Amino acid sequence: MIDDSSLTAEMEEEESPATTIVPREPPKIQRLEESVVNRIAAGEVIQRPVSAVKELVENSLDADSSSISVVVKDGGLKLIQVSDDGHGIRREDLPILCERHTTSKLTKFEDLFSLSSMGFRGEALASMTYVAHVTVTTITKGQIHGYRVSYRDGVMEHEPKACAAVKGTQIMVENLFYNMIARRKTLQNSADDYGKIVDLLSRMAIHYNNVSFSCRKHGAVKADVHSVVSPSRLDSIRSVYGVSVAKNLMKVEVSSCDSSGCTFDMEGFISNSNYVAKKTILVLFINDRLVECSALKRAIEIVYAATLPKASKPFVYMSINLPREHVDINIHPTKKEVSLLNQEIIIEMIQSEVEVKLRNANDTRTFQEQKVEYIQSTLTSQKSDSPVSQKPSGQKTQKVPVNKMVRTDSSDPAGRLHAFLQPKPQSLPDKVSSLSVVRSSVRQRRNPKETADLSSVQELIAGVDSCCHPGMLETVRNCTYVGMADDVFALVQYNTHLYLANVVNLSKELMYQQTLRRFAHFNAIQLSDPAPLSELILLALKEEDLDPGNDTKDDLKERIAEMNTELLKEKAEMLEEYFSVHIDSSANLSRLPVILDQYTPDMDRVPEFLLCLGNDVEWEDEKSCFQGVSAAIGNFYAMHPPLLPNPSGDGIQFYSKRGESSQEKSDLEGNVDMEDNLDQDLLSDAENAWAQREWSIQHVLFPSMRLFLKPPASMASNGTFVKVASLEKLYKIFERC
């Protein structure tokens, strides 16, 4: 028998050396050598060959050059040569030319706010000398000869030597990153780096149309970029990007000078709906400085997503001018980003103008004509229950029995062209912005390839996939829409069977699954007027009240509405980030997510949606929270019957005028014209709502179901699908089909 105490003692002895913590002296802080500091800084400023070209070209522009030539070898690693015809560099300035923080652009920090030049830090040339071999040849106006000098680690390797030169400056950067082995190994794709240099100079050429640019590979005769001085910016775009781009551009201008301090001018060119490209090209200059702005790019892409066909991307050139004190240019080592005062307002105004311009120009489109050879289509299926099967060549095709013959095809249903004949409403709804109306005509997109990183969302998606019913999935993928049987059920055909399908249940499940799969990747529907949460929630509470005449409950309803409003305000950041449900600081709802790109939910159900978020979501547990919010969104976006009764059949009585005079007249005459006794405005709204719902069910819901829906096993038994007929049984009764 083993003694427990001795065993415990032995274990403690074995573990004690591992748990002993040896005191350690804190490391000594040392001052880095200046050469180390300079090399680290050089790696930040000159990140790849295109960074060096950008700095050198900007220096040439600061020198009032009218012609700039760039020669590149091995993507810029072997050689970068930039020549210009600017004012040159004085002989007495050459000794300190490549020292850090030496510049002719400013003398004190306050000069940053009135700076008109590209460079200002005095770091670019210095950084190049720490990671490459730099040679400068220059001559100023009036000099008899020029000077050439080489630099290394910020200092001259020798005194300037007299040489023959043409007006301006030529800077050669050789063996870039020769002393940074890791950086050099990551830049072995010379074609990629040269492409970035060509793209940079192309962008520069269309903005600085008063300067001639050229770029070619070392030893090449033909230049890959060659622009000439042109009075028209559109001509510059045509010469650089080609006629196919220039002919599809529209001019756009925006300006603002309000009392709040948002002052700017923007002019540029944007592509129309006939332009087709696979990548967005945004050429953005702010105060004549080439920069990037991801927020502006994203805002423009959202507008174009509603108008461009397929996955096409736009071409956009914009030049924005602001007061120099409104721009902070000193926020990035390579100066590719700037910070703007009132940036969000500026982006919103530009986005609105682009949207208006596109909407006004979207009346006509150009399509390529192509001859179509009509061939006989055959239906093939590998399923055992399919009435038609594919036979090897050379064998006689077996005749399909008449009682199993299917004349429909789910991939080419009858009436598919109706999707392009959606009637436009006479007036836009007040609750949804015009952008969402434009977006409603967009064809179905695929879900984002990136999935959410959160394990809770991945578990929810995995749960949806694991509960999928294979038989129901096959039915959903290959069914054909027949028509609406009533307000809730649609008739669908699958092979030789006819089913009733509950469109409310199907759409609710589809929207729930889409919310999970598009988690944190939503586009947004902008409401034209922000809606106060408290009023909407209070309205939902009153609609649920079974005793509306009881005023004693009003205080309780108001308190519940206030509590839910505060709760949603508290969760606003999470709702915005993950679900694109935007609630501002004043507790107003201003944006909703796009679950299906062709579909806008019934805005009359917003109060019910907000109340559901407040009452039915378990906010404390992450997985339960995301599931509850997704379920609430799924129920809100589900294709419920409109609140107005269906005017077909008995529902028409709801729209009768209830005026006393008309009722008396009806009683007296007995045969008054029914049309004269109807509220035509209300009837028209109802007819439009029901027609829009049926169109959405046929052309949005069912195509999206075939792409995205994973029907759960519960749908096989809860009445979502009900089999009503089959060709085999009908043939037994009628002996014909």
Curated annotation (Swiss-Prot):
Entry superkingdom: Eukaryota
Annotated segments matching region Disordered: 1-21, 378-416
SUPFAM superfamilies the UniProt entry points to: ATPase domain of HSP90 chaperone/DNA topoisomerase II/histidine kinase (SSF55874), Ribosomal protein S5 domain 2-like (SSF54211)
Listed InterPro entries: DNA_mismatch_repair_CS (IPR014762), DNA_mismatch_S5_2-like (IPR013507), HATPase_C_sf (IPR036890), Mlh1_C (IPR032189), MutL/Mlh/PMS (IPR002099), MutL/Mlh/Pms-like (IPR038973), Ribosomal_Su5_D2-typ_SF (IPR020568), Ribsml_uS5_D2-typ_fold_subgr (IPR014721)
An example Gene Ontology molecular-function term: ATP hydrolysis activity
Any one of the GO BP annotations: fruit development
UniProtKB keywords: DNA damage, DNA repair, Nucleus
Any single Pfam family the record assigns to this protein: HATPase_c_3
Compositional bias ranges of the Polar residues kind: 378-400
Complex and partners: Heterodimer of MLH1 and PMS1, called MutLalpha, which is the major MMR MutL activity correcting base-base mismatches as well as IDLs. The heterodimer binds double strand DNA independently of a mismatch with positive cooperativity and has more than one DNA binding site. Heterodimer of MLH1 and MLH3, called MutLbeta, which is involved in correction of a specific subset of IDLs when associated with MutSbeta.
Function: Involved in DNA mismatch repair (MMR), correcting insertion-deletion loops (IDLs) resulting from DNA replication, DNA damage or from recombination events between non-identical sequences during meiosis. Component of the MutLbeta heterodimer, which probably forms a ternary complex with the MutSbeta heterodimer that initially recognizes the DNA mismatches. This complex is thought to be responsible for directing the downstream MMR events, including strand discrimination, excision, and resynthesis.
Full protein name: DNA mismatch repair protein MLH1
Phylogenetic placement of the source organism: Eukaryota, Viridiplantae, Streptophyta, Embryophyta, Tracheophyta
